Amino acid sequence: MEAVQIVDDNVRVFDEIYEIGMVTEEIIDAAMTKPWWQDVQYGVIDIAGTQHQAMPAPAEVWLANTGLYLSSQKVGIMDGTERLKSFLKVDPIAGYPRLSINPNCRGLLSEFGAVPNPFTGQTQAYRWKMDRDGNIVGNTPEDKYNHGVKALIYGLVYHFGFSYASDRQKIKVKHW
């Protein structure tokens, strides 16, 4: 779970709950003890969080326990990656990216490969599939070590919409 502030279209990830082996109710309890909880206005969840698997869907548990409705929508891997990249690029006017991450958010930072994974101490970054020679294989990244990144992407898409390539100029080329 990533806690985010949006100020002037700049996204600041300032806290997280990055745990393994916890059920939805335990994550909710942890979130509700945070000083920022009283200011939470909305949340997002993976589309899978709306599905029942022999128990109430996590989105329903959040609504019942907190009164907070979590929005969800299908976000394709490449669409989400493009939206994230648009916030990682340096804004030419401001001189810095529109996304900043608190250094204490070690779970999310580990998924970007910036710090070791907080549970294993190993580098376990969200990355592209590679062959033995280090070449990228396939059209999508490996679906692991990405829970924080995906949460961030869902929030970016929810708040800012999908990212689209700007109009590209067509250059006419004369053939001989």
Model segments located where?
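Charge-patterned, long linear interaction tracts outside catalytic cores
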Residues: 135-176
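Mg2+-dependent endonuclease catalytic cores in nucleic-acid-processing enzymes, primarily RNase H-like
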Residues: 5-137, 162-163, 173-176
